[in-house]
Amino acid sequence: MKNLWLVLIMLSMFAFARADDYISVNNYIQNPYNNQISAGGRNFVTESDIQNKGLWEQFFTNGTYNAVGLASWAVLNVPNNNYAYGANLFMQSGHVGGFALGGMLEVVNPFLQPGYRYLSGDISYALLPNQQVVTPSELYLEYQLPNQVQVDGGWIFLETPWMNSYDDAMLVSGTFQGVLVNYQMTDNWRLTAIGTNAYQEMGSNSFNQDTMYNSSYGNFVTRSPSTGLQQVIPNGYGSDGSLAFGAIYKPSADYNLNLWGYSFSEYANTLYADSNYQVHLNSSNKFNFGVQVGNQNTWGMANTVPELVGYGGVNSYLGGAKIAYSYDEWFKAELSYDGMYGQQSSFYGGGFISPYTFTIVNDPLYTSGLGAGLIEQGAGNSWRAATTFHPIPGDSHTKIELAYEQFNTVSPMQEWDLDIKWVPEGAPRGLIVHWEADYAIAPSSDLVNGGDFFFMQTILSYNY
């Protein structure tokens, strides 16, 4: 952690560059609902708001809030089903002298708790808590020098490739205790530094050293690669925290490059990069090309958790590519491929380990499906074919995504996905109906997910 503080000091000393709008009083990067439709619209702070208001008025009126009501029902291999409901309130004050306060309160299942009475065995689904959850998932102090530096410290929300707090199928988020620093080095380059020492997994009321591999959060699909048990890594084998450093290069809206390095304490180091480039044939037709590479290792680490529990150390390489075609924001088709390889005696036959995206499947891999990806299925290769479209051209009220994934991995699987988002015409602004379904087939001898598997979830949300 000492190294992180040195980086923070250095970033603050060299904050003298112009920037894009990422570090801005109008971009609330701690808000999980920052880019979603809201009935209350957006509060845009102007230069006049900053110059002509008193300090208290700036604090109370130059900020933002989102109140989100949520209800969801999921079916996990009929007749196993579960529901959850609740509301989340995010609030951030306006900046005064560069400083702002923010936080989010999550309230799930306040009156009736579904528990496990609708579920067989120990099948659990972390995105839909089975118990009552009332917790401040975020509480932070922010300092911002617009277009140059932003520091967020406390219980914070992260949105990076391998530490991602939110997915639109979640009723609750997975937040971190730590510090996030963004520094706009030039107009095109932004640097990011992260240091954390605790994690609050979905459905928890407190921050701790657990990861998504601990047995309390065992997934309904993925089981131990060596024993077939749902207890992937026993409780008590957690992580003391993480360090991450990123460099984001974005010279235009059509090209970006992301470079990341992570150190997940007691687990592994991760080096990762991806790049995307769009080619416009004309105003309606365009292609998108992407590549991603990565490496995991245990340099400088002794007695990592995977080794201690008998799964072998982490040692793996990743490579992937995608090509997509889109027409006039109405239709998109995409084909992607990922390969992940390492020593067969290493963790999951040479696979990656991902402490904070495992089983949530919100990692950056191109071929990840709704139910699983290479992180869940182990070393090998996978490919994905998908299409996204609006059923009625020119009408954006309904969006449908169809996808097929093939995993030629330690734990092989085929998966079909259907994802529908619907904004009812004439309904209150901010109301969204989200329905997704996943059907997977795996060999009966597959220790991860033997036989057929079906998952369906309906999410109703209202954002104000």
What are these regions (language model features)?
Residues 33, 115-133, 137-138, 148-252, ...:
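Surface-exposed coil loops of outer-membrane beta-barrel proteins
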Residues 76-82, 145, 158, 166-173, ...:
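Solvent-exposed loop/turn segments connecting transmembrane beta-strands
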Residues 108-114, 189-242, 284-359, 433-463:
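Outer-membrane beta-barrel translocator/channel fold
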Residues 12-16:
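N-terminal signal peptide c-region/cleavage motif recognized by signal peptidases
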Residues 85-89, 135-139, 177-179, 241-245, ...:
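Hydrophobic, lipid-facing positions within transmembrane beta-strands of outer-membrane proteins
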Residues 18-158, 182-183, 189, 283, ...:
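Beta-barrel outer-membrane channel/assembly domains of diderm bacteria
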Residues 332-423:
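C-terminal structural cap/anchor segments
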Residues 68-75, 151-166, 191-193, 245, ...:
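Transmembrane beta-strand segments that form the barrel wall of outer-membrane beta-barrel proteins
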